[in-house]
């Protein structure tokens, strides 16, 4: 009996200690505090709901959609001369070949613009009186979309190398390949996420005039262009220096509303200038250049202009990104495959010096003894 009483007493004492400990714990820490700690822990460990995730992704997409990138590359001669089939033989029908080292870059942007200096035609007996005339089969126009090129200007001195038939055949080949194009003193509009982008192409024998430029820009603005690009063919072959026409017309175009001036013809890189709120690319040099098997100046670049929304519906050029390249991926003989230079190399820095206007090398005497 005493043993039973001792056991009962021990049980009662133990229960009393437990109850007393609980009361003291509540008084010391409080139930509210314990609840808040629990709630916070739960909030930190909870996975975001699908609705929250969707909202965050939508917000990120809206932020990203406020920026667009347009890439500019230089002369693309995707053909061989009448005297040498080197380019055609190297490509051998592989449309991905010329831009294999840069296609990923050009396809990752929003739009890419190039200067096209060749004829696409399958016409039998089509010959040119010109020494520097380049022609490829019509299906070689497919190289452009395969490499990420979205638009080409044909406003240059090679437009009529094979006369009317060559010009017509080239236009048809580009249309079949799905590549928009414009010739001398012509305009083009395209839509980019609701914004109209206008392009004006002009050669006029290396001398775009104020009247031509103003008329074209006004026309594009009237058609709703919120961003205007002027593609001019001008300058002196082989020269790193600007002509008076380049300097004057570039500035005039900007003053009339051009946001980017894109130059070609010198076959070498010339400086980039920020004028007012616009970007002037005086010359982008050669890019994939089938016109020469061993060009002496192999420097080129991909220049990317970043567009952002400005006041109202207008877009503005907010940044410029430069990717220095070599027009060939091999030393010596041109393989026609432009490739980015490694950052920090002498070649990389040399491209930057040409584009920032500090390059001090002599002008080239253009030599076409190695016509492709």
Positions of the model-derived regions?
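N-terminal hydrophobic targeting signals that begin at the initiator methionine
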Residues: 1-5
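Acidic, metal/ion-coordinating pockets
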Residues: 7-372
């Amino acid at each position: 009996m005493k043993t039973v009483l001792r056991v009962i007493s021990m049980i009662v004492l133990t229960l009393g200690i437990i109850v007393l400990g609980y009361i003291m714990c509540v008084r010391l820490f409080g139930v509210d505090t314990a609840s808040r700690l629990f709630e916070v822990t739960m909030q930190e460990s909870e996975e975001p709901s699908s609705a929250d995730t969707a909202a965050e992704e939508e917000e990120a997409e809206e932020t990203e959609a406020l920026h667009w990138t347009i890439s500019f590359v230089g002369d693309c001669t995707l053909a061989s001369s009448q005297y040498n089939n080197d380019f055609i033989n190297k490509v051998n029908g592989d449309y991905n070949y010329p831009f294999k080292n840069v296609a990923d870059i050009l396809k990752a942007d929003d739009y890419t613009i190039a200067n096209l200096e060749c004829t696409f035609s399958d016409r039998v007996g089509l010959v040119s009186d010109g020494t520097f005339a380049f022609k490829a089969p019509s299906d070689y126009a497919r190289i452009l979309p395969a490499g990420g090129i979205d638009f080409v200007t044909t406003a240059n001195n090679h437009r009529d190398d094979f006369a009317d038939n060559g010009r017509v055949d080239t236009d048809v080949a580009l249309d079949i390949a799905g590549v928009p194009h414009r010739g001398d003193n012509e305009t083009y509009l395209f839509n980019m996420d609701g914004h109209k982008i206008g392009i004006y192409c002009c050669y006029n024998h290396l001398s775009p005039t104020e009247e031509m430029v103003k008329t074209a820009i006004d026309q594009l603005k009237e058609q709703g262009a919120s961003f205007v690009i002027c593609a001019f063919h001008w300058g002196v072959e082989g020269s790193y220096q600007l002509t008076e026409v380049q300097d004057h017309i570039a500035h005039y175009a900007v003053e009339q509303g051009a946001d980017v001036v894109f130059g070609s013809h010198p076959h070498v890189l010339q400086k980039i200038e920020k004028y007012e709120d616009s970007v002037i690319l005086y010359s982008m040099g050669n890019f994939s250049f089938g016109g020469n098997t061993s060009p002496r100046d192999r420097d080129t670049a991909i220049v990317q202009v970043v567009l952002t929304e400005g006041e109202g519906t207008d877009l503005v050029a907010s940044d410029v990104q430069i990717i220095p390249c070599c027009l060939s991926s091999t030393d010596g003989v041109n393989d026609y495959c432009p490739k980015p230079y490694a950052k920090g190399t002498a070649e990389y820095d040399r491209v930057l010096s040409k584009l920032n206007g500090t390059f001090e090398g002599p002008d080239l005497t253009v030599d076409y003894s190695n016509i492709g």
